[in-house]
């Protein structure tokens, strides 16, 4: 898969406002400041397609991007930012839950975690929620350039334990040096491939 075209479509407070239905969707989820915007920019080879912010919790809306005129990348609000009041957290939680329950086009979720830290309670909750909903996902361990190659495997162990995945199922990612980009593009190609119709009996 090659990303030849990428454009920002809309921001929305509720998924019900989205008019771009009909195309498959890939959602990007993760806590605030885990590098979602940077991943989207690197994936699309565009420096400022998704606005990156030094202020965690900036993405308070669901942002939709159209890639290759053939699928949508849905950037979900970052969760788990301490400075946000309880009401706002509840609103975010409902916004995301509504999206997962209402989107018929969702094919896969990219769950971003920082490779340098153990997954938070919010990461575990998201993981459990996706499993209960039966939504396929892949864990993306971001900021891999911040640690040595040798340390990566060691850092993956607590992530695997917390999120019940195997090391080979995780994509180590760096928006700085492009680590994991080819792997992620291959995953998207597989996920977006039209489902083969079962042969008639």
Where are these regions (language model features)?
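Helical mechanochemical/support elements of P-loop NTPase systems and associated helical scaffolds
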Residues: 22, 48, 61, 72, ...
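Flexible beta-alpha connector loops of hexameric P-loop NTPases
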Residues: 79-89, 145-148
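Conserved C-terminal guanine-recognition region of P-loop GTPase G domains, centered on the G4
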Residues: 94-168
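Conserved G1/Walker A P-loop phosphate-binding module
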Residues: 1-83, 200
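Hydrophobic packing within well-folded, soluble alpha/beta domains
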Residues: 39, 109-110, 184
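Residue-level signal for inorganic ion chemistry
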Residues: 65, 142, 184
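Conserved amphipathic alpha-helical interaction elements at protein-protein interfaces in regulatory
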Residues: 45-49, 102, 132, 190, ...
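Canonical P-loop GTPase G-domain recognition
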Residues: 3-15, 146-201
């Amino acid at each position: 898969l090659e990303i030849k075209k990428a454009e920002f479509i809309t921001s929305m407070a509720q998924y019900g406002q989205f008019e771009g239905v009909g195309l498959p969707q890939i959602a990007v989820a993760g806590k605030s400041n885990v590098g979602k915007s940077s991943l989207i920019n690197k994936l699309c080879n565009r420096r400022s397609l998704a606005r990156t912010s030094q202020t965690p919790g900036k993405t308070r809306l669901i942002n939709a991007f159209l890639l290759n005129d053939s699928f949508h990348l849905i950037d979900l609000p970052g969760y788990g930012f301490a400075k946000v009041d309880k009401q706002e957290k509840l609103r975010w939680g409902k916004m995301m839950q509504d999206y997962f329950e209402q989107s018929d086009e969702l094919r896969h979720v990219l769950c971003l975690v920082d490779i340098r830290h153990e997954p938070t309670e919010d990461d575990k909750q998201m993981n459990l929620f996706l499993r209960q909903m039966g939504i396929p996902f892949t864990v993306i361990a971001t900021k891999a350039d911040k640690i040595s190659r040798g340390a990566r495997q060691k850092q993956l162990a607590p992530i695997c334990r917390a999120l019940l995945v195997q090391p080979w199922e995780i994509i180590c990612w760096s928006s700085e040096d492009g680590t994991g980009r080819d792997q992620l593009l291959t995953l998207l190609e597989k996920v977006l491939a039209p489902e083969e119709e079962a042969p008639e009996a």
